Design a protein with these regions (language model features):
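Nucleotide-activated chemistry modules centered on ATP-dependent adenylation/adenylyltransferase
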Residues: 1-210
Length: 210
């Protein structure tokens, strides 16, 4: 997969520009940053596995996400630190706790909000903690993400099998209505297809966000 090679080149470039101790992976338990974590840990790159991983926990997290973060700790044999709060406040806290940090590796994709013009290497905006944002997955589509997950048996949160396609927290996320299986006259409970079955996914991925 050419996009995978491009992503690994970006990660390699990051490791040539910064020491592993100067970078961290921003992790939220979602599919995109899980693919990012897997790429970094499967890559045969010097010091790649030394890059710290930080779980930015929202105010009202799904228990399934919490469980999945623990599963990733075990699956990859890594320490995942936890920082609570919104992303800006979390980054401020992270940088105060470890002033040597200079770069944040993220799972952002071009179809994500405010990412249309994002570059693979781009500094944070004014008013934010000063970091280089590194975006190895920028050109991946939602279909690319799911193809990689299924081809490489990458673990993912159970919510995705229940129709959730873009996961925030319990106050702003519902199953994607485009995956709803209508109940028949028997009165059976409404169900949802898995996230990886969503058609035109880059367009409808966030339809379950409130």
């Amino acid at each position: 997969m050419e996009k995978r090679k491009d992503s690994l080149r970006i990660i390699a470039q990051a490791l040539s520009s910064y020491r592993a101790e100067e970078m961290f992976i921003s992790f939220n338990g979602g599919k995109d940053c899980t693919v990012l974590l897997d790429l970094i840990h499967q890559a045969n790159l010097k010091d790649a596995k030394k890059i710290k991983c930080i779980y930015v926990r929202p105010l009202n997290p799904f228990s399934e996400i919490e469980e999945f973060v623990d599963r990733c700790r075990q699956h990859y044999g890594i320490t995942i630190a936890t920082v609570d709060g919104g992303i800006k406040a979390a980054l401020e806290q992270i940088c105060r706790a470890d002033p040597q940090l200079k770069a944040c590796i993220m799972g952002s994709r071009r179809s994500d909000p405010y990412c249309e013009r994002l570059a693979s290497f781009q500094e944070t905006d004014p008013g934010w903690p000063r970091l280089m944002r590194i975006n190895p997955l920028l050109e991946w589509t939602c279909e690319d993400i799911w193809s990689y997950i299924r081809e490489h048996n990458v673990p993912y949160c159970a919510l995705y099998d229940r129709g959730y396609t873009s996961i925030g927290d319990r106050t702003n996320t519902i199953p994607n209505p485009h995956l709803k299986v209508e109940a028949d006259s028997s009165g059976e409970e409404v169900t949802y297809l898995p996230a990886y079955t969503l058609q035109d996914a880059d367009k409808y991925e966030r339809a379950g966000r409130l």
